[in-house]
């Protein structure tokens, strides 16, 4: 079927699937905006080239496919320079949907289906095609849906401002899309016809959006919409769609690690049960639903069996990552170890140094290593086995890139595994910090600033009083912090201020005033912050001097009371002695 042909003939498959649906709409839209010359549209001598141009534009501004047509576009642009210049012009133009139009459409989401459909038609006429249309076609709605997705963050802000339900707007948009999908099949008497590649992509885009919103119930409904019409999309070697399999594993097989409940030993109190926290609890990029559980274990094993046999599935980083998380959530760590050994030839038993390892799937990435680390910790409540396997990966795959998410998860898990009663200085977390510095130094890279990593290290510094760790963190992240502050990142700025104040407070309490001055000069970052830190330092020094003064006065007062009490005892002794 389509994905099999895509692997064998990428250019041909992409063009064939989208020529009929998007060529006319996209090129017509470009003509309306004066981007493409009329000759490009009128001459039928270049149908393939014309499609490539429209497909490239759509891919650039709104559709991020799992496959790409960059090679095809490069070839065609070399043949026709007009197309190349038109592409560049459109890319620069962008054509975003204005705020007023978005507000009008979002407000209409509370109306009935017919009124909402009219509003969507108005939006299409306003942004894409000025010709009035009573009813949008499926192709038009697909184009608009993807364009709205690129502006989803702006739409979320508008929904917040006008007190509209953001998720309901998207679900109503999908309902309209699904209605048109089925209506198309009724018109041509193809009720049982499967969804094509574009329709599957649009539906998966909506699933991704609802997962980010924490609306797993709505995401499940869209997944069922796909599976009902394409029942072989999960387990057929020819028809398997990677995005749909990934979403199936996330929604029905437990492969959403941010939802996993992890025991937090660092917050455990004597006589109380350990607190359970979620890995994504502090993450603001996604919202978590209140409940999450895996349901379909049998299909997971069938998907794993298919994935380990099909090369195109083994080469998918997202699929392997979610498959690992699914086994981890299911508690099948032995199966997980065998899968890791089968794909990357890495096992808990160390290989001899002379053995040459050849991977069968995609090269291990940071996302895959995070899934391995989290999956083993979820079952063991300990980092030992996960770190042992990761050490083998880094040793035998030296080109693996460890991004900010990897270090964030490592610090989160090491923090959760830390037991203050047994390790008062949190040496396990500090060891992870030194490991991170060594890795970046070996690659001659600067660590990227990550809010959650900074927050975890701040909590450790505050709980243990290890202010040299805080200074080391600021020193290592200083270039990245300066860049981030220039971009007005409020959250990062707030956590940096917490670092600074905590360190200044600790240094002042220890009477190291010269060290305080050096710290402010080195990590003030700008004039305003330096001024604020100097004021804070002066206040802390005043409070310290006042506290010391009160302490001395209280000591003198206690000494005076003691001496007076001693004199009274002397007088009493003299009186009693004279009586005797």
UniProtKB/Swiss-Prot annotation:
GO molecular function: RNA binding
Annotated Gene Ontology cellular component terms: mitochondrion
Keywords noted in UniProt: Mitochondrion, RNA-binding, Transit peptide, Translation regulation
Classification via InterPro entries: ATPase_expression_mit
UniProt transit peptide range: 1-40
Disulfide bridge partners, by residue number: none
UniProt-listed GO biological process terms: regulation of translation
Subunit structure: Binds to the 5'UTR of the OLI1 mRNA.
Task of the protein: Required for translation of the mitochondrial OLI1 transcript coding for the mitochondrial ATP synthase subunit 9.
Recorded family membership: Belongs to the AEP2 family.
The protein, known as: ATPase expression protein 2, mitochondrial
Species per Swiss-Prot/TrEMBL record: Saccharomyces cerevisiae (strain JAY291) (Baker's yeast)
